[in-house]
Amino acid sequence: MRCPFCGHDETQVKDSRPSEDGAAIRRRRLCPQCEGRFTTFERVQLREITILKRSGRRTPFDRDKLARSISIALRKRPVEPERIERMISTIVRQLESMGETELPSSTIGELVMKQLKQLDDVAYVRYASVYRDFRETQDFARFLGEEGLSEAAES
């Protein structure tokens, strides 16, 4: 594997172990050229999924992009990284089990919202505000009312 620091083509695996949920192999690597250390994850990929964007563009599914968007919603929230990783793995498995090679981005958005609602209300509202394109405070109030979260917002 290529070193992300210096670009050297060969790196050494120093440690390998299964991830906590058993869905990946975590590897610690060392570059003999620059002595940089980094971690990689190896996962089974059942099929290539293409995402159909609202604009009509097609892009390959990117697990890391999914993880980043979820991490933004969960920023500064008291949720353990292991729970976040399990949630991401659950969403990816659900997408792969749909048996489709092409999925609309709205499918991912709805799965993320469903999982976040179970995990953390604040992250759920944060994600919804971007996903549903809230523009005014009334959009938040309407959403909170629809979701039965308005009482929590008032207390």
Swiss-Prot record:
Assigned keywords, A-Z: ATP-binding, DNA-binding, Metal-binding, Nucleotide-binding, Repressor, Transcription, Transcription regulation, Zinc, Zinc-finger
Example of a GO MF term: DNA binding
Domain ATP-cone: 49-139
Free-text remark on how the cofactor is bound: Binds 1 zinc ion.
Zinc finger (unnamed) stretch: 3-34
Positions of the UniProt region annotated as Disordered: 1-22
Any one of the GO BP annotations: negative regulation of DNA-templated transcription
The keyword Transcription regulation appears for this protein: yes
Alphabetical list of InterPro entries matching this protein: ATP-cone_dom, NrdR-like_N, RNR_NrdR-like
Biased composition (Basic and acidic residues): 7-22
HAMAP family: NrdR (MF_00440)
Function: Negatively regulates transcription of bacterial ribonucleotide reductase nrd genes and operons by binding to NrdR-boxes.
Family membership: Belongs to the NrdR family.
NCBIfam families the UniProt entry points to: transcriptional regulator NrdR
Name used for this protein in its record: Transcriptional repressor NrdR
Species whose genome carries this gene: Phenylobacterium zucineum (strain HLK1)
